[in-house]
């Protein structure tokens, strides 16, 4: 989730999207602002000073459409499935000699935020039939 934490939709972007859907009277589009406001409020409490709503799922789907805009590395990873302090956390092993019990996965380290932002805005500011 570290990379997806940076896939931010800012309040200014949300206002622009909402104004567009109000002007076009797009009822489906009008659900976007309340949804993103909900996430922004949640993340503002858990991460004060965050600049907007992280779009974890959006950036994951966006990556499938734009694999050239994301930098990946193959890294041995273990997910902690057991209850306790590490529950749900992923441990990436960056050492040269790794634990053979860790499976290797692709991890995203960087993505083209400006391109992501442009694509999000082009998608949400498109008039539907």
Task: List PLM regions with ranges.
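N-terminal acidic, glycine/proline-rich low-complexity segments
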Residues: 1-129
């Amino acid at each position: 989730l570290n990379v997806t934490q940076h896939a931010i939709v800012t309040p200014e972007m949300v206002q622009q999207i909402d104004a567009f859907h109000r002007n076009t009277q797009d009822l489906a589009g009008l659900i976007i602002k309340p949804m993103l406001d909900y996430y922004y409020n949640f993340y503002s409490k858990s991460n004060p000073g965050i600049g907007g709503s992280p779009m974890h799922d959006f950036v994951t789907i966006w990556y499938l459409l734009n694999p050239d805009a994301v930098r990946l590395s193959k890294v041995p990873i273990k997910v902690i499935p057991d209850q306790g302090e590490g529950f749900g956390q992923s441990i990436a092993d960056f050492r040269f000699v790794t634990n053979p019990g860790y499976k290797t996965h692709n991890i995203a380290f960087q993505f083209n935020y400006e391109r992501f932002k442009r694509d999000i805005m082009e998608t949400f500011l498109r008039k539907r039939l």
